[in-house]
């Protein structure tokens, strides 16, 4: 089986399409902050897609934004499917991707450690 399977290709196209639709803006006032669609995973039967999103905002705002995205999922899946000309519209599910926040935290901790070392602290 190829690493470039149809579900993987469709998931990547869906990710790009979803990012475009979100970038154009949603009317839901809960959707604020900088949103990045970091990945997408399509089920083998192409009936469900999980979109991984990173939201650069404070915790409360991030939760509201994720709620807004989930509330808009039917609209978003329809818009993306229309742009991709898919025969069937996959059910869209959002998951918050913590990897970016974790990476930022690790980078901050490393920077603090380097600063302590440069000042001779232990």
Swiss-Prot record:
Gene3D superfamilies reported for this sequence: 3.30.300.20
Record-linked Pfam families: RBFA
Origin species: Anaeromyxobacter sp. (strain Fw109-5)
UniProt-recorded Gene Ontology molecular function terms: ribosomal small subunit binding
Subcellular location: Cytoplasm
Protein name according to UniProt: Ribosome-binding factor A
Role of this protein: One of several proteins that assist in the late maturation steps of the functional core of the 30S ribosomal subunit. Associates with free 30S ribosomal subunits (but not with 30S subunits that are part of 70S ribosomes or polysomes). Required for efficient processing of 16S rRNA. May interact with the 5'-terminal helix region of 16S rRNA.
Coiled coil: none
Subunit details: Monomer. Binds 30S ribosomal subunits, but not 50S ribosomal subunits or 70S ribosomes.
GO cellular component: cytosol
Keyword Cytoplasm recorded: yes
Gene designation: rbfA
Keyword terms, alphabetized: Cytoplasm, Ribosome biogenesis
Gene Ontology process terms (BP): maturation of SSU-rRNA
